[in-house]
Amino acid sequence: MPLLSLQNKNLFLEISPEMGASITKFCDRKKNKNIFRPFPKTKKITKNNCYFSGYFATVPYFWVIHKDTFFYNNKYIKLSRTHPLEPNTIHGEGWVKKWKVKKQTKTSA
């Protein structure tokens, strides 16, 4: 799946729908400087390499859910593991699923 590029006169953003909308490049066009760490050219765009991106979507929750379980409304809720390299459920599901772009313009997707 190709990378998605968005830009305006000041900023350039490159997103990988394949890696859960991970940001592979985000830079200031006028200063020609990276704002986020760019995705390494030596790495392949895969689910397991999203950690190398400058940012990935942590939705619908952020951080670690210890032993994949939390307590809510007087009951325990068990979640499935979100990433094969992680021992606990972590960062929601948005970053480990392919995203489908429904609409794109030069500056939005």
Task: Go through the PLM ranges and name each one.
Residues 1-109:
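Surface-exposed acidic/polar loop and edge beta-strand patches at domain peripheries
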